[in-house]
């Protein structure tokens, strides 16, 4: 079996292409999956660069998509030949979150999907949307489901609402697409006019270059006639949260998803209180959420934006490209 392992000390130079024993046939309740694609997330980047400690020899990548090759006894949800996509929190099936760490997350606490074959419990997967390539399906595990949960489950977005998406990475572009299909107005930010033009082509109603307009919260208020947005997709963290609060309407919802500007910082609590806003942290979602999202994608025909696909053996180059921040949407691996 072809796989990538991460040797310690972590770093892109310590990602190794290796041959490992075949995982064998599935036992009761398990499926064997030929993995064809994965997609890169900043969580994965944190693991492979050592910002998030992992075991020596860990197989990285939390996202995986492929085809069922065999099913174990008692599995009736999947059949040989089904296209499937992995899940971020394998044990979170339904209901509210009960997990606050990454001990069970593939590519972090357990081995991930940078390999060509896995045998896993069937509930670690859902069906992939109809008509999706494996690379497109792989983008759903983390980025797609995070955007879905933020807008649909937590913020309860409805037609006529206004959404602010920060940046043009995987989660933000999914949020833009989901919000537009739900009848919302979308404001997108980026430091690149080229990326903003691409966001506009996807349906963004307003665009703001935050490098040129450093007081971008004021620009958001201009776009909303002083009201502010109903929902903010906040991926920046401490350096952007203050302006996100100012850009959000009184009683609005801020989905705290990313920490691109740092893992800790001051929270303007008085402004948050005065504006009666909900600040909700979240990390991905449950199996039930993912199945709901897949049904919605089947119904709407929304397709992810895959910026570039790298071969598995070029995984270090893929992460270097991600770290440079030049991509729009998702980066994927072909396995």
What are these regions (language model features)?
Residues 23-38, 48-93, 109-112, 129-132:
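Glycine-rich beta-strand-centered segment in the early N-terminal region that forms part
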Residues 162-168, 180-243:
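Adenosine-nucleotide cofactor-binding segment
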Residues 102-103, 235-305, 335:
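Glycine-rich phosphate-binding loop and adjacent beta-alpha segment
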């Amino acid at each position: 079996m072809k796989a990538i392992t991460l040797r310690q000390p972590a770093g892109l130079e310590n990602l190794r292409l290796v041959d490992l024993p075949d995982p064998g046939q599935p036992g009761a309740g398990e499926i064997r999956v030929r993995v064809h694609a994965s997609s890169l997330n900043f969580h994965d980047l944190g693991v492979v660069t050592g910002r998030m400690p992992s075991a020596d020899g860990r197989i990285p990548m939390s996202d995986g998509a492929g085809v069922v090759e065999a099913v174990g006894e008692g599995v009736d949800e999947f059949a040989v030949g089904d296209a499937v996509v992995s899940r971020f929190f394998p044990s979170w099936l339904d209901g509210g979150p009960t997990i606050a760490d990454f001990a069970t997350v593939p590519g972090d606490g357990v081995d991930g999907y940078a390999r060509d074959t896995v045998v896993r419990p069937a509930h670690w997967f859902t069906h992939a949307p109809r008509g999706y390539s494996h690379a497109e399906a792989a983008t759903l595990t983390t980025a797609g489901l995070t955007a879905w949960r933020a807008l649909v489950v937590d913020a309860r977005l409805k037609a006529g609402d206004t959404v602010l998406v920060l940046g043009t990475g995987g989660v933000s572009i999914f949020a833009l697409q989901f919000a537009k299909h739900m009848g919302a107005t979308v404001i997108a930010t980026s430091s690149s006019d080229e990326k903003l033009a691409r966001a506009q082509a996807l349906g963004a109603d307003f665009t703001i270059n935050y490098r040129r307009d450093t007081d971008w919260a004021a620009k958001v208020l201009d776009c909303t006639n002083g009201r502010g947005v109903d929902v903010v997709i906040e991926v920046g963290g401490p350096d952007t949260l203050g302006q996100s609060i100012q850009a959000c309407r009184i009683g609005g919802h801020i989905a705290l998803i990313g920490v691109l500007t740092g893992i800790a910082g001051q929270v303007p609590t008085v402004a948050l209180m005065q504006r009666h806003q909900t600040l909700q942290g979240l990390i991905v979602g449950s199996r039930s959420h993912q199945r709901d999202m897949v049904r919605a994608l089947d119904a709407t025909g929304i397709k992810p934006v895959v910026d570039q696909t790298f071969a598995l053996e070029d995984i270090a180059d893929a992460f270097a490209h991600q770290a440079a921040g030049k991509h729009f949407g998702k980066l994927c691996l072909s396995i």
